[in-house]
Amino acid sequence: MVLRSRLPPWIMLCSVWLLRFAHTGEAQAAKEVILLDSKAQQTELEWISSPPNGWEEISGLDENYTPIRTYQVCQVMESNQNNWLRTNWIAKSNAQRIFVELKFTLRDCNSLPGVLGTCKETFNLYYYETDYDTGRNIRENQYVKIDTIAADESFTQGDLGERKMKLNTEVREIGPLSKKGFYLAFQDVGACIALVSVKVYYKKCWSIIENLAIFPDTVTGSEFSSLVEVRGTCVSSAEEEAENSPKMHCSAEGEWLVPIGKCICKAGYQQKGDTCEPCGRGFYKSSSQDLQCSRCPTHSFSDKEGSSRCDCEDSYYRAPSDPPYVACTRPPSAPQNLIFNINQTTVSLEWSPPADNGGRNDVTYRILCKRCSWEQGECVPCGSNIGYMPQQTGLVDNYVTVMDLLAHANYTFEVEAVNGVSDLSRSQRLFAAVSITTGQAAPSQVSGVMKERVLQRSVELSWQEPEHPNGVITEYEIKYYEKDQRERTYSTVKTKSTSASINNLKPGTVYVFQIRAFTAAGYGNYSPRLDVATLEEATATAVSSEQNPVIIIAVVAVAGTIILVFMVFGFIIGRRHCGYSKADQEGDEELYFHFKFPGTKTYIDPETYEDPNRAVHQFAKELDASCIKIERVIGAGEFGEVCSGRLKLPGKRDVAVAIKTLKVGYTEKQRRDFLCEASIMGQFDHPNVVHLEGVVTRGKPVMIVIEYMENGALDAFLRKHDGQFTVIQLVGMLRGIAAGMRYLADMGYVHRDLAARNILVNSNLVCKVSDFGLSRVIEDDPEAVYTTTGGKIPVRWTAPEAIQYRKFTSASDVWSYGIVMWEVMSYGERPYWDMSNQDVIKAIEEGYRLPAPMDCPAGLHQLMLDCWQKERGERPKFEQIVGILDKMIRNPNSLKTPLGTCSRPISPLLDQNTPDFTTFCSVGEWLQAIKMERYKDNFTAAGYNSLESVARMTIEDVMSLGITLVGHQKKIMSSIQTMRAQMLHLHGTGIQV
């Protein structure tokens, strides 16, 4: 290698050695953009040196024999050195922040003889920013100092002999820059330096693909803490996620940070690595939100790549509302087994579902009616004057009633099953058809209704025969109701003439009257409404005072005779039953067919009607089935399912209701028994008696609609919320039940099956009496239970005289109410626990009664005992019970009285299966007998070592033992009470009721 230099030979040899070992072969970092690299230039650098004899450029070979260029200076013998070396003009490109990397060696001044005063070990780095090359002159005052550079390690003469490398690397930053380029300058002030390499670069974040977004090359910011936000561009066949655009940040070190948002593959494409590939044939992706392509659903296909949906096969369709992942479907086949039933001008159609529903669950039915001339073979649509029950189209059930047909006319009915794709099909309609001929028509509408006479409590009406009787009119039906009630409840009167007098009306009240005619073909339509206001009390009194006294006496006598005849007649026919007999009631309660005196509302047994349907229509409102929406099944009754749903009457908001349905295949007797409950309930109107909304008897299924009670039966509700109510809340529930029973007793109605299971609770904890319609017959079996068609009802709630002599009165209901009180205060425990029915009857006859439930106030238990008096005449009336409970509610302190203060001691009821506690020798044996031996140590630790001490324990004592389970507390306390009773009975201190 040839060297040309003005430096001393020992300096040059050192430099050559350094050059041979200066190149490290370091790879360029990917995030750096090189502007200048002296090592990469093999020709002369030709930088400017001032003065010319200062810095000197030399060349050499590295270990790979590649030429490299370097600059050296070693003016250490003279002081005040000022040697400048300037690079050529460097274009900065897009950089805002420049990095300068220097690699150099520096001689230790102490290793040079005679230079201690003039030798330095540092040099200075400068830059000058300019938009263009300014030539070869160096104006020192234009340059800005970057830093003073010192060596971390310097070498000596000894290092040269040992061939040790001591190469220094320093990096400095410049910026922010505002011009197009710049110069670098190196100032030597008297050091011995070899500038091995100079590298100038800036950093940027290289282009990458992240979350399917392409982020381009991005130059870093001008500050060390800068983060440059970059918005990505989605790769091919991808799109930005909604409201989540892809973004990343380029740091000052050239690294991508903080990814935000992303791109997702479009419909028909799925992600594979950093690209989106199309779905293959037979696959699809309907939305960019889906991750992967899916196989086409049943009866669909895709014959090209990148499909966003699959096309349906021939004869198969997809409804507009069907999502793409749903299989293609087809219209259903025709309904099966179409049958009909003609009733004069009304036709009932029933059918079975189609054999093929087309693969859908939204099958409904629509009816097409055609009136036909069979002689000419032509049919025309029936027109809009035909009525359909419940409706003509959109039928969910498989039956319909078509009304208002012409008499003696020919009709064809087509029943078509449709689903969500029927309207898309171009195939021929599939339907079941039937042709019929109607019979005689019902009469037309009654007209000319007029009021003839209006009094205080009666109205006389007259009317004209229908214009088209269509047969012999056998009777007229007058429907009337108070206008304020808006037909919520109505009454009917029937007559054979074209006039009638409606009695027992309220004075000063507006009534609405409508009349319809009846023939062998059925009822015609009601006449238009006629509003009539009865006279006020004062007006009637004034009128009556003007009458002749003799006439008044005669009228009173005649009225008295009529009343007597009706009472005798009612007594005779009163032995007929509706569901269950009232014939065994005593006194005035035996006469359940009452003449209705003004101001008194009395229960009327529906069975007194020759036609039970008349009782239903008199006491229950007929509802339109289309106003009822059944939502779900909540139970099963004796006659069918019990459902919850909504009732929407015209002009009113919809309300939640419970719907009892009559099962398919019912007998006429079952139908009458089913509707008998509605006939009974329709007579009641009290906030603590379940309210009847109405009935549906003119369609299928037959329904009874009552108000919906959210919390269900009282016994199950109490068991579910064991211990969660205050005594006041429980007494409030009992007061509501008593108020409902008082109302029923005042009407002369005997419930006969009063129990917590037959009390319903609404969302406001209001209790209401229910269950009025089951048919009950007393059997002479040893278990003494009621037998119904649906099962047996236990006698635990029944009064002794009702079991033994079948005497059912309001007093027997009071006995049952006492049992309900016990159920409520014990949170739904079973009365008499596991005792057999025969044991219960025997214990009651011997005078034993149920003990007070845990934490039951003495006053409440005393009221229970009063209800359980053997002599029914000594039991309180429901009116008295309501008064007693009202006093307790007004004086809550009375409910805190300890049980021990009962005025009349009793012997708690003893189960024959209960262990004889006198046979136990220890507390441990007793606990083992009642399966509570786990608490033996608790009793021993508390000092309860004898049964006598245990018998004196209270509920607080039991809780103090650490027994936290409420069920275990109740079981132990009940056993203690029984133990206490046995001990008292043993010593002759027990007193029976």
Curated annotation (Swiss-Prot):
Residues 28-550 are extracellular. Belongs to the protein kinase superfamily. Tyr protein kinase family. Ephrin receptor subfamily. GO terms for cellular component: dendrite; plasma membrane. InterPro entries: Eph_TM, EphA7_rcpt_lig-bd, Ephrin_rcpt_lig-bd_dom, Ephrin_rcpt_TKs, FN3_dom, FN3_sf, Galactose-bd-like_sf, Ig-like_fold. Its EC number is 2.7.10.1. Residues 918-982 form the SAM domain. GO terms for molecular function: ATP binding; axon guidance receptor activity; GPI-linked ephrin receptor activity; protein tyrosine kinase activity; transmembrane-ephrin receptor activity. Heterotetramer upon binding of the ligand. The heterotetramer is composed of an ephrin dimer and a receptor dimer. Oligomerization is probably required to induce biological responses. Receptor tyrosine kinase which binds promiscuously GPI-anchored ephrin-A family ligands residing on adjacent cells, leading to contact-dependent bidirectional signaling into neighboring cells. The signaling pathway downstream of the receptor is referred to as forward signaling while the signaling pathway downstream of the ephrin ligand is referred to as reverse signaling. Among GPI-anchored ephrin-A ligands, EFNA5 is a cognate/functional ligand for EPHA7 and their interaction regulates brain development modulating cell-cell adhesion and repulsion. This is Ephrin type-A receptor 7. Residues 572-993 are cytoplasmic. The modification Phosphotyrosine is found at residues 603, 609, 786, 935. Its main location: membrane. Keywords: Apoptosis, ATP-binding, Cell membrane, Developmental protein, Glycoprotein, Kinase, Membrane, Neurogenesis, Nucleotide-binding, Phosphoprotein, Receptor, Repeat, Signal, Transferase, Transmembrane, Transmembrane helix, Tyrosine-protein kinase. It is found in: Cell membrane. It comes from Gallus gallus. The active site is at residue 753. Phosphorylated. One of its GO terms (biological process) is brain development. The keyword Cell membrane applies. Residues 1-27 form the signal peptide. ATP binds at residues 634-642, 660. The gene is EPHA7. Residues 628-889 form the Protein kinase domain. Residues 331-441, 442-537 form the Fibronectin type-III domain.
